[in-house]
C-alpha cells in the first residue's frame, strides 16, 4: 500500500490561486489554461509529485448510467422476492422515472445555478471563499456536477481497490477540488444537464446502511417509487445527502434534525419558484413522522424471506461456482452484488415452507436429542430444486457456532455447494441395485440363492479386483436369510442378503455405472462411485457418500419414467439491461428404459403395501399409490426416499449429521418419543409422508395410480434358482445346497466359538 501524501496547508496564496483556477475554468481558457496555475496551487515539491498524477482524467468511466446496482432473487414465479444482494443498495432509474419534485428539491438544495453554469459555479465559489476564508464559516462551493464527479471517482477507486485513488477522491485537498473542476468541465461538454442530474440522483448516498440513489431511498423511507415522490418526500430525501448518517429519517433520534433540514429544502424550493407559498406552508406544517413508512433493509441469505435461507445459500454457491457468471469467483461475487441481476430461481414457496414446517415438527430445533433432520425436494423431469427443510435456522454469524438451533451449512447439498461430505443412506440405496439388475437383463422375480457370507472375489469386475476377503451380511428384520428370494421381495423386505446375491451375479461395475446414469456422485469429491473408496461390496447396502439432494434427484428419475436431470436452482438470470445470462443446464435426457422404471416403481410400492414390507408407514392419504423406500445405516442415520409420479421427489435423512458415529440414533428420545432402535420407518418415513401429504393437498396434485405397471420381460417368474455368482439349479438342488451351507455355517461358527473360548481362557491365565 502506498504512502498517503501529506495534506498541504491552505495558504492565502494557494486559496487565491484556486479561486483563479475556478474562474479560468468557467470563464476564460478552460482546462488547458488552468494547468498553468497548478504549480501555484500545489507547490513544486515532492508532495506535488504524489498529487499531480491524480489530476489525469484518462481511464475514468464517465457513463452516467453505469453504476453498481443491487441484485434481486425471486422464487420460481419470477415476482415473489426472496432477498437482495448489494454492497451499495441502489436501483438505477432514468430521469423520466424520477418525480419532478425530487429533481427540483436536489437542484434547489445543492446547486441553484445548475442549469446555467458550465460545470463550475463561479458565484458559488466566491460565496464559499468569502464564507470560509474571510468569515471562518466553512461553506461548500461545489456544483452538482462536481459532486457527481466526486462520487464517480470514489466509486471507481473502491472498485479498483486503490487506496491512493480513494484518498485523492475523498480527502479535503486542493488537488481533489481542481481535479473535480477539470472533469466537471469535460463532463458538461459530453453530457447534457438531464443526464448529469440523472447520474447524481442515482449515485448519491441518501442514508445510512449503504443506501444510494433516490429509488432505493423512496422504497426505504416511504414504501413508494421515485416517480411517485411528492413535495414533502422529495425534500426529505434531498436533505439527507449533506450528512447521510445524521439526517437518515429511519433513525428515530435523527428525526428532529431531519425535519429541520427538510424544511430548509422546502424553503429553498419556494424561494426558487419550484413550489407555491401555499404548497410550502402545507409541507412545512406536516410532521415528518407522519410521512414515513420505513421498510426493513433486506440483503443476503440471512435476510431471505419464506424461510429460504438455506435455498438462497445454495443458489449463491451455484452462482459463485458457475463460469457463466464470470471468470473468477471474485468476478462472480461482484456481478451478484453490483450487477443489478434479476435472479429467478426454482424455489417453490409452498414446498420450501412445508419442508421446513415438517422438519421442525418432527424434531424441534431445541430438542434435547440434538438430532437433525434434512430434507430435499426436486421436480421430476426438470431438475428443478423445489426447496429444503432443516430443523435449523440459517445463520452465517459466529454466534451460531454455539447454538444448536442455528447453522449456515446446508447438509442437504454437496460440499462445493455449501454442504457436508455426504452420508451413508442404508437401504434407500437399493432401488439403484434393482435398476442395474434389470439393465443386466434379469427379472425382479428371479429366484436367487442368498447367504450371509460372501467372498469379495464374487463381485470382481474390470475396475474392482475383488480380493479374497469375506463380506458378512445380515438382515435387520429377520437377522438371517430367506432362501431363495426374489429381488422384488428382497427390496420390499429390505433384505441385504438379496442385494449381495444380485451383486455377485452382475458385479460392482454394473451397479456403479447405473448409479452414474442415475446422477450419483460423491458429495465430497464429486467423483463417480467407481473412483472413490466407497467402491466396495458394502456400497450395495448404502455405504456411500451422497447428499440428500442427489438422492432426491435419483428418486426423481424413478418418478419421471427414467428421465435424468442434474439439479438446478436457476430458471433465468437477466442483467441490468434485461439481457439473459446463460444459466447451468439440467441436461435432462432419457437414461433408463421406461419399462425398467415402471417395474422398479411396482417393486418399490410393494415395500409399502405388503404386510411384510418395510415401508408401510409411508402410505399416503386418499388411496394414493405410494412409492417410498426406507433406509437405516447401522445406528447412525435413518432415511426415506420417495416420489409422487411426475410431480415431486423427496429425500429425508435423520441423525446427528455432524457426528453420526459418536452420537448414534439409538436408545434415545426424540421429540418426547423413546426408541432403543430407530430406523427409517420410525421417524424418516413419517416425516416424508407428512410432507408429501401436505404438499399434495396444497397443490391439489392429481392421483396417478396407474404408475408402476411391471413389464413382462422384467417381472417374469422362474422355477429355477440363480446361484450366488451365477448359474442355475432346480428347487430340489437349491434346498440341498441350503442345508449344506447351513451345516457349514454352523460348523464354522462352532469352531470360531471354540477359538474364542481358548483366547478368553488364555487371557484369564495371563491376568
Annotated model-derived regions:
Residues 710-767:
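Proline/serine/threonine-rich low-complexity "mucin-like" segments in extracytoplasmic/periplasmic regions
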Residues 79-91, 214-220, 243-252, 331-336, ...:
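Short pre-catalytic segments that frame enzyme active sites
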Residues 98, 108-121, 134-140, 188-193, ...:
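Bacterial peptidoglycan biogenesis and beta-lactam-recognition machinery
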Residues 134-158, 297-302, 442-511, 536, ...:
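Conserved catalytic neighborhood of penicillin-recognizing serine enzymes
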Residues 345-366, 375, 388-391, 396-425, ...:
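A penicillin-recognizing enzyme superfamily signal
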Residues 40-43, 60-75, 139-147, 152-180, ...:
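Extracytoplasmic/periplasmic proteins that interact with beta-lactams or build/remodel peptidoglycan
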Residues 67-276, 492-496, 503-507, 519-521:
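Peptidoglycan glycan-strand catalytic modules in the bacterial/periplasmic cell-wall system
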Residues 1-72:
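N-terminal type II signal-anchor transmembrane helix
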